[in-house]
Amino acid sequence: MKTTYKEIREIEEINLLIEQGNATLKELGYTEHSKKHAAKVSDTAGKILTELGYGKHKIELARIAGYMHDIGNSINRHDHAHSGALLAYQILKDTEMSLKDVLVIMTAIGHHDEATGDAVDPVSAALILADKTDVRRNRVQNPVPATDRKSVV
């Protein structure tokens, strides 16, 4: 792996996708899915694999997947894991990352949503757990539930 988590966080396209997804979800009444959430999930996924004794390489893959996991929200909340996996592939294939590593990250992102995914490997398992543990109260962006917003808008 030549491309690092630190470098991934500096890629403008990724950050814009995260910001667009968060703006869209805010309008729909969802909790915050900003770069702060992405960084928190990334950090937690890395810590999970560290605690379980995985090597630095796999930990770095989990951190990258954690940061990028919600980029699919920029397209649509429905099926965001799958569209996010495809976006991640398109972005990461143009980095210095090996195709094998790109596919591990793509798979983890594609499987992180509990409705459509499964823990198919350590990176995807860490990502699923990390995403679900970010339950900060300040993630609430809109006090009107998404189901009630149509009558408000």
Task: Annotate the PLM regions.
Residues M1-H80:
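Acidic/His-rich, divalent-metal-binding segments that scaffold phosphate/diphosphate chemistry
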Residues L52, T95-L99:
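Inter-helical turn/loop segments and adjacent helix faces that build the functional surface
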Residues A62-G66, S83-G84, I109, I128:
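Short alpha-helical catalytic segment bearing the HExxH-like zincin motif
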Residues D79-Y89, L99-K100:
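Post-HEXXH active-site segment of zinc metalloproteases
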Residues S98-R149:
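Histidine/acidic-rich helix-loop-helix segments that form or flank divalent-metal centers
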Residues V152:
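Conserved small/polar residues in nucleotide/adenosyl-binding loops
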